[in-house]
Curated annotation (Swiss-Prot):
Alphabetic keyword roster: Acetylation, Metal-binding, Phosphoprotein, Repeat, Transferase, Ubl conjugation pathway, Zinc, Zinc-finger
The organism's place on the tree of life at top rank: Eukaryota
Biased composition (Basic residues): 593-606
Organism whose genome encodes this protein: Homo sapiens (Human)
Recorded GO CC terms: extracellular exosome; histone acetyltransferase complex; nucleoplasm
GO terms under biological process: protein ubiquitination; regulation of cell cycle; regulation of cell growth; regulation of DNA biosynthetic process; regulation of DNA replication; regulation of DNA-templated transcription; regulation of transcription by RNA polymerase II
Residues with the N6-acetyllysine modification: K32, K38, K298
Gene name, Swiss-Prot/TrEMBL: JADE2
Name this polypeptide is given: E3 ubiquitin-protein ligase Jade-2
Zinc finger (C2HC pre-PHD-type): 251-285
Reactions performed catalytically: S-ubiquitinyl-[E2 ubiquitin-conjugating enzyme]-L-cysteine + [acceptor protein]-L-lysine = [E2 ubiquitin-conjugating enzyme]-L-cysteine + N(6)-ubiquitinyl-[acceptor protein]-L-lysine
Modified-residue entries (Phosphoserine), positions: S9, S15, S117
Length: 790
């Protein structure tokens, strides 16, 4: 040690210790100074460092890169070098502090296996067949000291010594036999004698009798007695049996009465418990599965009046009560209280296999009034008897545990293990002393396969129920989310419908305002046709277009107002709109006359065939002829249906004629500039014959021009203006030359609008209840002809 210290003092590079060790070396150097400098108190040179690290091992590992080594002489570190590794390797601070192991050489196990092999097949249930396999019991210090003592005595007696493995094996066999015999004693009359108690009754039906297939079963923990059918036991177990509450290790309180314990069954939720007897006697409660007598259902069906009843026996308002079956008696009591007080509880089996329950109070029970004074003294006595039974059971169990050694015979153990009986007796006496010192508790815990698996089954049931509740919770969460989304969707739909309704009412209001100002019903009020007309490049070229020069029906001449309106219509679109909404320019008598004359065709009389064919009298072969606006007005007034506005299909090279029975003027263009290229053969023919229009006589048949559509249901169709030549008119007057009017329709609509677009506004206008006079009708005809002329 001194040599190491001198080495540390010379060079610090080869030191094997840290700074803490260096302090001790410096102290040792100072100790070599003259004695005159030393103090009187002794220096602690023996103090050693608490930790020692060797750095020479790290230094020996490091070599320069230029050093020549073969690939087999070194290892390559894949991890990066850490700085804390430079600290070194920790070594023990003092070699004398290292504990030295103490070992013993055991003799070879040749003799005992050879002795036990012939009888190894004769071993019992709890013994191990092979010795070298080990034992469940491990020797402790007390066992080791006792083994030394017994070996010394055996040596004095010149007998073979006892080894540790044999001692462990014998103790394990004693514990196994004791556990088996004690379980058998508890289950039989020799142990407690409960099964043969004549006074015990079923906790559900209160019957002391059992029968084949419906045996009386006792719980091994709470000692409750039930019939198989009463508690829903499908198969009687061979070993011990525990009720539902004992299997789960709980002691719940009944939901319907204040009593704890007894034959309880869970509700559907599994969190509340109810006596089976309470479930049977309360009429609103039901049982889900009669075979298993669980779960208890329909607890919520119990009325509030029953929950409010107070028991006349226990004076508590807990749970629910039943009432006396006598018609004039309303005494209430709990079911379990009635059983404990010995009230009369009858179970009557009806003819239709229906069970009726009759319960009576103390007054109406058989012998109730006579036994009423003695009922109170018998209550403590009955409770005392029950307590005495329980106390007796506990005493017998305790006595059985104290006399555990009587359940094991040393000779049986010696025979099963093929050992000397005297040696087994020595171990047996030691086993009794050690177990007594352990408060009669077993030295070995029962095996896992020896534990009743009923509790595990109950745990599995609860686990499956928990999983079921988890899935149910998830399903309910999905349903909640779905309901929320459906509700949000319906709210959005409702808001959209309300918005559409508001838009509809606003449109109706605007339409009513327009109709009140005299807007024509044949004009598209919804604005579709009007907007399309304004979007076109309308070209109007006219020099002298006077309404006075137009031929009139039956030679009648119009008032000068229509002619003035026609001249104003040639200016521009804004003037057209202003005159359309001006109520001052309205003809009076002609429109009234036209309405009066249009009633004749409304009677559906077939007109005679036309005298001649012409371009203006062509009809579409697959379309029915339409009625004039005057017919619509007359029929609408007569209650045949609302007028339907259907604008005619116009082309750029043909102008319509006036209706047959009205006083509207006829537009004729004898001489016109070259028209546009016709789109259809019919239009080409109409253009060719446009300058030579023949007006038929009064008997001319209606032949509409252009695309006509059949009338819609429950509505009277309107005959378009210019659909056929004028009927009932005389020879036409001289007509002045008028230029050709070119009206360019939009290519998308082509001057045609569907029935849905036109008829909806008509229905809205009629629903508005706007009544138009005769002058308004005449003004509408003039405005319509003005639009056609433009």
């Amino acid at each position: 040690m001194e040599e190491k210290r001198r080495k540390y003092s010379i060079s610090s590079d080869n030191s094997d210790t840290t700074d803490s060790h260096a302090t001790s070396t410096s102290a040792s150097r100072c100790s070599k100074l003259p004695s005159s400098t030393k103090s009187g108190w002794p220096r602690q040179n023996e103090k050693k460092p608490s930790e020692v690290f060797r750095t020479d091992l790290i230094t020996a590992m490091k070599i320069p890169d230029s050093y020549q080594l073969s690939p087999d002489d070194y290892y390559i570190l894949a991890d990066p070098w850490r700085q804390e590794w430079e600290k070194g390797v920790q070594v023990p601070a003092g070699a004398e502090a290292i504990p030295e192991p103490v070992v013993r050489i055991l003799p070879p196990l040749e003799g005992p296996p050879a002795q036990a092999s012939p009888s190894s097949t004769m071993l019992g249930e709890g013994s191990q067949p092979d010795w070298p396999g080990g034992s469940r019991y491990d020797l402790d210090e007390i066992d080791a000291y006792w083994l030394e003592l017994i070996n010394s005595e055996l040596k004095e007696m010149e007998r073979p010594e006892l080894d540790e493995l044999t001692l462990e094996r014998v103790l394990e066999e004693l514990e196994t036999l004791c556990h088996q015999n004690m379980a058998r004693a508890i289950e039989t009359q020799e142990g407690l004698g409960i099964e043969y108690d004549e006074d015990v009754v079923c906790d559900v039906c209160r019957s002391p009798e059992g029968e084949d297939g419906n045996e009386m079963v006792f719980c091994d923990k709470c000692n409750v007695c039930v019939h198989q059918a009463c508690y829903g036991i499908l198969k009687v177990p061979t070993g011990s049996w525990l009720c539902r509450t004992c299997a789960l290790g709980v002691q719940p309180k009944c939901l319907l009465c204040p009593k704890r314990g007894g034959a309880l069954k869970p509700t559907r939720s599994g969190t509340k418990w109810v006596h089976v007897s309470c479930a049977l006697w309360i009429p609103e409660v039901s049982i889900g599965c009669p075979e298993k007598m669980e779960p208890i259902t329909k607890i919520s069906h119990i009325p509030a009046s029953r929950w409010a009843l107070s028991c006349s026996l226990c004076k508590e308002c807990t749970g629910t009560c039943i009432q006396c079956s006598m018609p004039s008696c309303v005494t209430a009591f709990h079911v379990t209280c009635a059983f404990d007080h010995g009230l009369e509880m009858r179970t009557i089996l009806a003819d239709n296999d229906e069970v009726k329950f009759k319960s009576f109070c103390q007054e109406h029970s058989d012998g109730g009034p006579r036994n009423e004074p003695t009922s109170e003294p018998t209550e403590p006595s009955q409770a005392g008897e029950d307590l005495e039974k329980v106390t007796l059971r506990k005493q017998r169990l305790q006595q059985l545990e104290e006399d555990f050694y009587e359940l094991v015979e040393p000779a049986e153990v010696a025979e099963r293990l093929d050992l000397a009986e005297a040696l087994v007796d020595f171990i047996y006496q030691y086993w009794k002393l050690k177990r007594k010192a352990n408060a009669n508790q077993p030295l070995l815990t029962p095996k896992t396969d020896e534990v009743d698996n009923l509790a595990q089954q109950e745990q599995d049931v609860l686990y499956r129920r928990l999983k079921l509740f988890t899935h149910l919770r998830q399903d309910l969460e999905r349903v909640r989310n779905l309901c929320y989304m459906v509700t949000r969707r319906e709210r959005t739909k409702h808001a959209i419908c309300k918005l559409q309704e508001q838009i509809f009412h606003l449109q109706m209001k605007l339409i009513e305002q327009d109709l009140c100002r005299g807007l024509s019903t044949s004009f598209p009020i919804d604005g579709t046709f009007f907007n399309s007309w304004l979007a076109q490049s309308v070209q109007i070229t006219a020099e002298n277009m006077a309404m006075s020069e137009w031929p009139l029906n039956n030679g009648h001449r119009e008032d000068p107002a229509p002619g003035l309106l026609s001249e104003e219509l040639l200016q521009d679109e804004e003037t057209l709109l202003s005159f359309m909404r001006d109520p001052s320019l309205r003809p009076g008598d002609p429109a009234r006359k036209a309405r009066g004359r249009t009633r004749l065709p409304a009677k559906k009389k077939p007109p005679p065939p036309p005298p001649q064919d012409g371009p203006g009298s062509r009809t579409t072969p697959d379309k029915a002829p339409k009625k004039t606006w005057g017919q619509d007005a007359g029929s609408g007034k007569g209650g045949q249906g609302p007028p339907t506005r259907k604008p005619p299909r116009r082309t750029s090279s043909h102008l319509p004629s006036s209706p047959a029975a009205g006083d509207c003027p006829i537009l004729a263009t004898p001489e016109s500039p070259p028209p546009l290229a016709p789109e259809t053969p019919d239009e080409a023919a109409s253009v060719a014959a446009d300058s030579d229009v023949q007006v038929p006589g009064p008997a001319a048949s209606p032949k509409p021009l252009g695309r006509l559509r059949p009338p819609r249901e429950s509505k009277v169709t309107r005959r378009l203006p210019g659909a056929r030549p004028d009927a009932g008119m005389g020879p036409p007057s001289a007509v002045a030359e008028r230029p050709k009017v070119s009206l360019h329709f939009d290519t998308e609509t082509d001057g045609y609008f569907s029935d849905g677009e036109m008829s909806d506004s008509d229905v809205e206008a009629e629903d508005g209840g706007v009544q138009r006079g005769p002058r308004e009708a005449g003004a509408e005809e003039v405005v319509r002809m003005g639009v056609l002329a433009s």
